[in-house]
């Protein structure tokens, strides 16, 4: 929705960049459990102001799935366990039979990550001396003291940081979903 392929001029030729996508199904995801895919790379993200990504969620084989039961996340850092930023977004489920772009790709499912939010939560973590633990912040960058019982807000990012990640040295990115309910989910 509203995305156009980036064009790069090379040797008097205009080359269109490839559009990338990923589709996967997750079933029997237990409470608080997460699954994702990752890509190793070497990237310096300091030159970017925002990262945007469109996410779609749907029921799988008529199994029940309600809005907010699955949460999409993007984790980026020098590793996936000790030094990373994480951004989460609760997912709105696309109704069966939807064919309009805005129904398939609802606004609430669009990651729009301001890079300065990541630098601000890192500064807060340094000031509080709490970078060793996974620490969560809401969309207004206020500390969430009990993330497991604080509900996600539709259409709003939830940020997290652990360790000492650097936007200048991103070596791995993970994209996935986690179960935000007390039941198993599938989607």
Locate predicted features.
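Extracellular/surface-associated beta-sandwich interaction domains
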Residues: 1-187
